[in-house]
């Protein structure tokens, strides 16, 4: 669970003032103003102690909650020492609230104070990636596999870097309808040592026909079935590709383990003997038809003829 963010409520419309906490402070001031910090300490302690009426568990005790990210995309314009102090105050508040779950902090912003992130007791660090860009206003065309070939972390030499877990709090190769990009992107994350990978964002079914959630993203199994299959295959990549495992550079890395991605065919595939998943029509033969336990796809394959447009 991400405990806090400091954005308005209006996207894509204008914000509507509600008198909430986020309207009392500027996005950057909220992390430096003493009164605001004190309020956040009280808030985060109350949040983890909150009892979910449906489960009967406080968030800090819920077995289905694995940890907390303290802030979504914080703003730290000050010094390393000021940033470290801010984080430590939040950590102390959580400790007093008897939280024992792992705690993470966003490190993909404010890199001038990056040293502070690794000089605290947070167990994990969170990152994001939009390798194709964002908010282009149209569906982009082309081969974007080179764009997802590497994920370089410029501050990986900082003291303490390798002692923190690495999590992706959001990613998307946005502004396109291709199905070949998700598995390649997740492969690159695993090569870079990431242990948790979150795609942003899935369109709710009631609005998915119109792509009105956050238009730069578009993903829903009913309306973008090829992309949804690509993400399904990417989930398998996250489990099957080893942390730090490398497959060379593009185009050699379009074939890796039991996976294949192709820009020309707009295709992602998993073919491991027991599972045969494909995001578009393919001529690939399953490794062993007699051992298949799961088939999922769009279009046709040597084992399924399908003329529909869904999955």
Language-model region placement:
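Active-site mouth of glycoside hydrolases
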Residues: 1-122
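Extracytoplasmic/secreted cell-surface and envelope-processing proteins
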Residues: 9-10, 78, 113, 135-136, ...
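Flexible loop residues that form catalytic
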Residues: 73, 130, 202
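Glycoside hydrolase catalytic-domain groove-lining segments
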Residues: 104, 112-175
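Glycan-recognition surfaces
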Residues: 122-153, 220-260
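Substrate-binding cleft of secreted/luminal carbohydrate-active enzymes
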Residues: 179-255
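Long, low-hydrophobicity ectodomains and other hydrophilic envelope-associated domains
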Residues: 239, 243-311
